[in-house]
């Protein structure tokens, strides 16, 4: 009988915290399947989900405000362990008969909590032991309200001078609350705390591993598709590449990929995609050379949003044209991943969680009467990368920096022309090459060159040159919501600038973008 890698599962209820997806990722890293659902998930759905344990996440609300979110009653009726984090602890306390009050002294940022009680959750986990034998943890706090009275049968788990009940526990029922955030890296022992809850207290086995996920996905694809043929739009990005590798392993020649070369890709990227999938892996790939069509459609357009729409529409036209030549296609594969499935804006209200529609190939599913195959829809990006490696994709492909869907079309400011794209491709290639040589590529989260349609005077030998300006952009980020410009060494910047100006005819000046996000965005358009 096949292994059920979803059998041991944790339910995470979202009350609107910016950290909620991080909790899910941490639980998955432990090797346990979990799902994220809105706090108002109905009781029947919770029972049907049948979790081994439940985590109540944080949120921006105050429990003593009217209509503030509450955990469903089923959470406390299932007789499974429950961990409340921040707001989750507060609503647990309030709903079970305790008391929560606003605090004059809010705690945001690093804090040290003293471990007070002898609980299963924190037993043997500490960062410090003081002279009196008191155990301490370095944690990350982000709260205004605090629990001032615990429900019956609870004991104090942890304490700070301004928050005497910074944690509470009832070992008999397996109920725990912590006012700090174990899911963020600033809480040094956070991984151990979550592992203790998920594995030791909830009894979950680590079945959620890369090799098991691949086997499970292959079995599901085969069961869904049978002997039918599947179409995939292959971009060369991480998600579509992993889908291609996974489907090829699952169904072989039943998969046909269409790779649209729009003339806005990185240097040699089209050839690399074809070499990897068609030549090395034997995947059926149709390459549609549509550079002229894209550039013709973009001619004269300088508005960034309109450029994006033109590129999107042209992609659909080209993809449709290629797909219509194929026979007996019944399924369309897409690289939808789990964060796409979770409605991001819904985290604020907690009630707007809907499944996004992902017709990233336009109206094709309806027009061609195709059914969708989305083998990555349960996975976070870091999990997609891990299974990419498991499937034999090269590390450099799987851990490549993000590249926007419209490609160089949004890295050329203003109107897109072939001349600009050719110059930018070469400049970007030099920048990335030098980052790799200096061991800076994987220290940055994203790095690229921007073409500016501005000319500047330069001197070459005894002659004057009037040529284009480009900007280097490199950032460091964890989540791409905020980003810091990368503090690259001056010597590296000097090398990159020198090579670009000397090796590329048409560039006279190289600048470096030192804007962080916010206020600037990572991409320029």
Swiss-Prot record:
Keywords: ATP-binding, Glutamine amidotransferase, GMP biosynthesis, Ligase, Nucleotide-binding, Purine biosynthesis. ATP binds at residues 235-241. Pathway: Purine metabolism; GMP biosynthesis; GMP from XMP (L-Gln route): step 1/1. Residues 9-207 form the Glutamine amidotransferase type-1 domain. GO terms for molecular function: ATP binding; GMP synthase activity. It catalyses: XMP + L-glutamine + ATP + H2O = GMP + L-glutamate + AMP + diphosphate + 2 H(+). GO terms for cellular component: cytosol. Its EC number is 6.3.5.2. The active site is at 86 (nucleophile), 181, 183. SUPFAM superfamilies: Adenine nucleotide alpha hydrolases-like, Class I glutamine amidotransferase-like, GMP synthetase C-terminal dimerisation domain. NCBIfam families: guaA_Cterm, guaA_Nterm, PRK00074.1. Catalyzes the synthesis of GMP from XMP. Homodimer. This is GMP synthase [glutamine-hydrolyzing]. The lineage of its organism: Bacteria, Pseudomonadati, Pseudomonadota, Gammaproteobacteria, Pseudomonadales. The gene is guaA.
């Amino acid at each position: 009988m096949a292994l059920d890698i979803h059998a041991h599962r944790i339910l995470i209820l979202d009350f609107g915290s910016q950290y909620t997806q991080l909790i899910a990722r941490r639980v998955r890293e432990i090797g346990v399947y979990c799902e994220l659902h809105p706090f108002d998930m109905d009781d029947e759905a919770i029972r049907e989900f049948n979790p081994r344990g439940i985590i109540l996440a944080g949120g921006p609300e105050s429990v003593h405000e009217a209509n503030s979110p509450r955990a469903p009653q089923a959470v406390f009726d299932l007789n499974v362990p429950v961990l409340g984090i921040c707001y989750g602890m507060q609503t647990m306390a309030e709903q079970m008969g305790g008391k929560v009050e606003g605090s004059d002294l809010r705690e945001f940022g690093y804090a040290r909590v003293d471990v007070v009680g002898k609980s299963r959750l924190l037993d043997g986990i500490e960062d410090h032991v003081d002279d009196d034998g008191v155990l301490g943890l370095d944690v990350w706090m982000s709260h205004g309200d605090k629990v001032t009275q615990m429900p019956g049968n609870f004991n104090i788990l942890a304490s700070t001078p301004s928050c005497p009940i910074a944690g509470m526990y009832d070992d008999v029922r397996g109920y725990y609350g912590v006012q700090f955030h174990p899911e963020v890296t600033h809480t040094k022992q956070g991984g151990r705390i979550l592992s203790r809850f998920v594995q030791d207290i909830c009894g979950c086995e680590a079945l959620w591993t890369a090799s098991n996920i691949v086997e499970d996905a292959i079995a599901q694809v085969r069961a869904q598709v049978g002997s039918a043929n599947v179409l995939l739009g292959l971009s060369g990005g991480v998600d579509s590449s992993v889908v291609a590798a996974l489907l090829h392993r699952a169904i072989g020649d039943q998969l046909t990929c269409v790779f649209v070369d729009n003339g806005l890709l990185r240097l040699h990227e089209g050839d690399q995609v074809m070499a990897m999938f068609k030549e090395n892996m034997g995947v059926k790939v149709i390459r549609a050379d549509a550079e002229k069509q894209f550039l013709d459609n973009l001619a004269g357009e300088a508005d960034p949003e309109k450029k994006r729409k033109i590129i999107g529409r042209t992609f659909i036209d080209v993809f449709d044209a290629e797909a219509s030549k194929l026979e007996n296609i019944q399924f369309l594969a897409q690289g939808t991943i789990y964060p796409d499935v979770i409605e991001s804006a819904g985290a604020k209200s907690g009630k707007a969680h809907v499944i996004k529609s992902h017709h990233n190939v336009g109206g094709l599913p309806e027009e061609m009467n195709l059914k969708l195959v989305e083998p990555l829809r349960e996975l976070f990006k870091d999990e997609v990368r891990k299974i990419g490696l498991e499937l034999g994709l090269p590390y450099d492909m799987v851990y490549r920096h993000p590249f926007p869907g419209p490609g160089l079309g949004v890295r050329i400011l203003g109107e897109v022309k072939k001349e600009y794209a050719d110059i930018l491709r070469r400049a970007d290639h030099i920048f990335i090459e030098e980052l790799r040589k200096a061991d800076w590529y994987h220290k940055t989260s994203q790095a690229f060159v921007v073409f500016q349609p501005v000319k500047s005077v330069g001197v070459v030998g005894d002659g004057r040159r009037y040529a284009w300006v480009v900007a280097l952009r490199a950032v460091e980020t964890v989540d791409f919501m905020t980003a810091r410009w990368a503090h690259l060494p001056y010597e590296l910047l000097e090398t990159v600038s020198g090579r670009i100006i000397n090796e590329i005819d048409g560039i006279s000046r190289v600048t470096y973008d030192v804007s962080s996000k916010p206020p600037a965005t990572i991409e320029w358009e």
